């Protein structure tokens, strides 16, 4: 592990620089400005020797008269190049953050569904916001400070060597000890930084869950529990931050001690070796001034190390995410709408190499017909609906669309043929019109209104203050459950896809609304292949075929009346919902 760390750091730097490369002209200008800034500082230190020697030892009136002009020009130029360097480096950093955030977001959007099953929204937000921001500190603040201070250190050491190389060599003997201290804190800070990122993800996750589920939190009296949980996470985060601070303190104090020993050694050497080393008062004071000036950049470089390590840990987290494989998306691009014939052939499926959820599932949905999936929770209904648009890849078997295996179609082409209305409605913090037209951004206002009318949403939309331009709030919080569901149905109607997936599409509606929506859906379903998932069997009586699932296997198929005549699983489920009676032997 120890040997791999420098190699890993170099690889991270190299990969990070690939994002900086497009902005190299501005970066180069910023680097040159910072080098000039450090050169001016080192030049002022060398001028100390001339000021003393030519102003007090051997007086040079011409030089003395030039001192105010030298100081004015030097300080003015120093301020200008400092501002230029800071602006250029910040511009590069924010540009890198923008590109990296866009890349991370685009990658997350295209990750397979099983990744979302394991990762929380808080963890993902932490990567986009916190981890990428740590990378910004490496590519701007840290880089600026590093260039300025390393150039200043080199400049000051050069000044010392020019003035008196013998004393300067003595000081250089302290460098290996500084390296030992920095190397130790490098590893410690990187390790702690990974913990800091993890705790930030936990803090974001806890806050996100509590805010989104505030109704449940309040009705079940969970405020104190959530506050305690959040406080524990923030306290753990604080402790990790303090560990980083301790590492910084050890770094700074250790380096300052080494430099102090170096300065003391040089002063003693200058006193005891005065007969061997000839040096003027101005030169001696200039060397001492240079050594004292070295303390600040050396201190900055050592504290900078913690920032760099946090940034590298952030980069590692971001790049690990970017290395995750995307959804497999190689296949044919369909230019026309399909007819909509669906066939499942010997389909098996397991999540993440676990036990099979589906076992040898076989059925056909003729184009333009409706098929309903029924069964107890966990029987595999939603899994079947998720396999069709390839949210998950099959473990075994084949699903065909108009005779073509869905794996041979591009994801965009495949999903373009489908509309979805699920039990958990997703609305965006945008206008009602834009929510209905989601995925059909070229739709006219007339088309949007027509879809809303078919979904029985037009009436309540017109009663809102801004009508179709009313913003719905985060996830449609300003709408009732039934209203949100009708907007989702209007969205599916507007897409006008040949395949319609209804996952408990009427579950959030009251009886009156459900009656209207059911009538609207029957009209929309005409000529479309429709896959219906429902718990309320009264809503699927008119489906062309009903498939009964139990423990991931198909146990019955047929029309509503045919299944009732069988007096099997479906008949028992129907009796339970209609009359509250059940034959336990049949359902088990």
UniProtKB/Swiss-Prot annotation:
Task: Answer whether the UniProt record assigns the keyword DNA damage to this protein.
Answer: no
Q: Which InterPro entries match?
A: AAA+_ATPase, ABC1_TM_dom, ABC1_TM_sf, ABC_transporter-like_ATP-bd, ABC_transporter-like_CS, ABC_transpr_lipidA, P-loop_NTPase, Type_1_exporter
Which reactions is this enzyme annotated as catalysing?
ATP + H2O + lipid A-core oligosaccharideSide 1 = ADP + phosphate + lipid A-core oligosaccharideSide 2
Keywords in alphabetical order, please: ATP-binding, Cell inner membrane, Cell membrane, Lipid transport, Membrane, Nucleotide-binding, Translocase, Transmembrane, Transmembrane helix, Transport
Which residues participate in ATP binding? 375-382
Q: EC number(s) in its UniProt entry? A: 7.5.2.6
Query: Which is a Gene Ontology cellular component entry for this protein?
Result: plasma membrane
- Pinpoint the ABC transmembrane type-1 domain residues: 28-310
The protein's GO terms of the molecular function aspect are: ABC-type oligopeptide transporter activity; ATP binding; ATP hydrolysis activity; ATPase-coupled lipid transmembrane transporter activity
The record, for SMART domains, names: AAA
Domain ABC transporter span(s) in chain numbering: 342-576
Q: How does it sit in the membrane?
A: Multi-pass membrane protein
**Which residues are listed as membrane-spanning?**
23-43, 56-76, 141-161, 162-182, 257-277, 278-298
Recorded superkingdom: Bacteria
Please state where this protein is localized.
Cell inner membrane
Q: Which NCBIfam families match?
A: MsbA_lipidA
Q: Give the family this protein belongs to, as stated in its UniProt record.
A: Belongs to the ABC transporter superfamily. Lipid exporter (TC 3.A.1.106) family.
What this protein is reported to do is described as:
Involved in lipopolysaccharide (LPS) biosynthesis. Translocates lipid A-core from the inner to the outer leaflet of the inner membrane. Transmembrane domains (TMD) form a pore in the inner membrane and the ATP-binding domain (NBD) is responsible for energy generation.
What note about domains is in the entry?
In MsbA the ATP-binding domain (NBD) and the transmembrane domain (TMD) are fused.
Spell out the subunit comment.
Homodimer.
The identity of this protein, by name, is ATP-dependent lipid A-core flippase
User: From which organism does this entry originate?
Assistant: Legionella pneumophila subsp. pneumophila (strain Philadelphia 1 / ATCC 33152 / DSM 7513)
């Amino acid at each position: 592990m120890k040997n791999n760390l420098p190699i890993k750091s170099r690889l991270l730097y190299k990969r990070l620089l690939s994002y900086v490369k497009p902005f190299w002209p501005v970066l180069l200008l910023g680097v040159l400005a910072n080098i000039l800034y450090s050169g001016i500082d080192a030049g002022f230190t060398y001028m100390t020797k001339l000021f003393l020697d030519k102003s007090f030892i051997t007086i040079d009136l011409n030089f003395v008269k030039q001192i105010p002009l030298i100081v004015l020009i030097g300080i003015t130029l120093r301020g200008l190049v400092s501002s230029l360097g800071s602006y250029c480096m910040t511009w590069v950093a924010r540009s890198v953050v923008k590109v990296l955030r866009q890349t991370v977001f685009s990658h997350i959007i295209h990750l397979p569904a099983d990744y979302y099953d394991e990762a929380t929204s808080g963890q993902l937000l932490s990567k986009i916001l916190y981890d990428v921001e740590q990378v910004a500190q490496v590519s701007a603040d840290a880089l600026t400070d590093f260039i300025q201070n390393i150039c200043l250190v080199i400049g000051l050491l050069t000044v010392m060597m020019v003035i008196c190389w013998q004393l300067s060599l003595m000081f250089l003997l302290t460098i290996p000890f500084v390296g030992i201290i920095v190397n130790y804190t490098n590893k410690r800070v990187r390790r702690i930084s990974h913990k800091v990122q993890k705790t930030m993800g936990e803090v974001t996750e806890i806050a996100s869950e509590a805010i989104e589920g505030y109704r449940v939190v309040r009705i079940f009296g969970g405020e104190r529990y959530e506050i305690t949980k959040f406080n524990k996470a923030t306290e753990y985060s604080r402790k990790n931050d303090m560990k980083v601070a301790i590492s910084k303190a050890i770094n700074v104090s250790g380096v300052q001690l080494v430099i102090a020993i170096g300065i003391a050694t040089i002063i003693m050497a200058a006193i005891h070796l005065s007969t061997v080393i000839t040096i003027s008062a101005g030169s001696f004071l200039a060397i001492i001034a240079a050594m004292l000036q070295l303390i600040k950049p050396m201190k900055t470089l050592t504290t900078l190390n913690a920032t760099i390590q946090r940034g590298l840990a952030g980069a590692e987290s971001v790049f690990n995410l970017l290395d995750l494989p995307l959804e497999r998306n190689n296949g044919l691009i369909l230019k026309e709408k399909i007819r909509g014939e669906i066939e499942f052939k010997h389909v098996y499926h397991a999540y993440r190499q676990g036990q099979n959820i589906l076992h040898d599932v076989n059925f056909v949905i003729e184009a333009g017909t409706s098929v309903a999936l029924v069964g107890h929770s966990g029987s595999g209904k939603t899994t079947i609906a998720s396999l069709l648009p390839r949210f998950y890849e099959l473990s075994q078997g084949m699903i065909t669309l108009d005779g073509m295996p869905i794996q041979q179609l591009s994801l965009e082409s495949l999903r373009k043929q489908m509309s979805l209305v699920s039990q958990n409605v997703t609305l965006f913090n945008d206008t009602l019109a834009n929510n209905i037209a989601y995925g059909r951004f070229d739709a006219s206002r007339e088309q949007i209104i027509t879809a809303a009318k078919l979904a029985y949403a037009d009436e309540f939309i017109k009663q809102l203050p801004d009508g179709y331009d009313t913003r719905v709030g985060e996830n449609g919080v300003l709408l009732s459950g039934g209203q949100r569901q009708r907007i989702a149905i209007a969205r599916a109607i507007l897409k006008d896809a040949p395949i319609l997936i209804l996952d408990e599409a009427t579950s959030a509606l009251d009886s009156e609304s459900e009656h209207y929506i059911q009538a609207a859906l029957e009209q929309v379903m005409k000529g479309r292949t429709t896959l219906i998932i429902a718990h309320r069997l009264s809503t699927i009586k008119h489906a062309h075929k009903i498939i009964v699932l139990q423990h991931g296997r198909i146990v019955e198929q047929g029309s509503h009346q045919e299944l009732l005549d069988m007096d099997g699983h479906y008949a028992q489920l129907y009796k339970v919902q209609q009359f509250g009676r059940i034959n336990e032997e049949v359902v088990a």
